[in-house]
């Protein structure tokens, strides 16, 4: 097995959130309406692959409390880092254009994510991973309350498809590995 590189994962989440934010400016969209909505709400799609292999390597059954808690901690860290980074970008260049009319409900949703990150069962998750998830959600909430967010949505959990195979993934999203 290996230890989860919490600092490296957090750094990658911040870096890719910024990269995806920049890509919104350069992206080609299939229709005018999708382009308009993408620029108004600045939705991103940060995600991960190989969760099933991560759990298998840790010796955690996929359909278990331990597996769900570990997956929740990794997901909370990724999602929280992305929103904290989005709030940092908003502090520098402003929130997404549709933020003003969505600020209050969005902050309530962010707070719900923050609260749920603090409810992850600590008995199954490495302390540094869980502490980082807690801290970053507190930061994402605080920064967002001060500056808003640059992006209305930041993450997506979907199969990575063929790119997952190019990254040498055994699983392409959150599904379990089908065989050893």
Language-model regions, residue ranges each:
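Long, C-terminal-biased catalytic regions of enzyme "large/alpha" subunits
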Residues: 1-180
């Amino acid at each position: 097995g290996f230890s989860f590189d919490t600092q490296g994962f957090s750094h990658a989440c911040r870096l890719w959130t910024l990269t995806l934010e920049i890509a919104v400016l350069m992206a080609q969209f299939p229709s005018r309406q999708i382009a308009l909505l993408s620029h108004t709400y600045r939705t991103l799609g940060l995600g991960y692959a190989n969760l099933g292999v991560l759990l298998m390597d840790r010796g955690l059954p996929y359909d278990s409390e331990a597996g769900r808690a570990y997956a929740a901690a990794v997901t909370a860290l990724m999602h929280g880092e992305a929103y904290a980074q989005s709030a940092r970008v908003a502090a520098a260049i402003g929130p997404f254009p549709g933020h003003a009319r969505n600020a209050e409900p969005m902050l309530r949703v962010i707070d719900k994510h923050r609260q749920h990150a603090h409810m992850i069962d600590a008995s199954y998750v490495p302390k540094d991973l869980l502490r980082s998830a807690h801290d970053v959600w507190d930061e994402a909430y605080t920064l967002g309350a001060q500056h808003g967010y640059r992006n209305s949505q930041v993450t997506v959990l979907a199969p990575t498809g063929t790119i997952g195979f190019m990254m040498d993934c055994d699983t392409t999203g959150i599904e379990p590995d089908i065989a050893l």
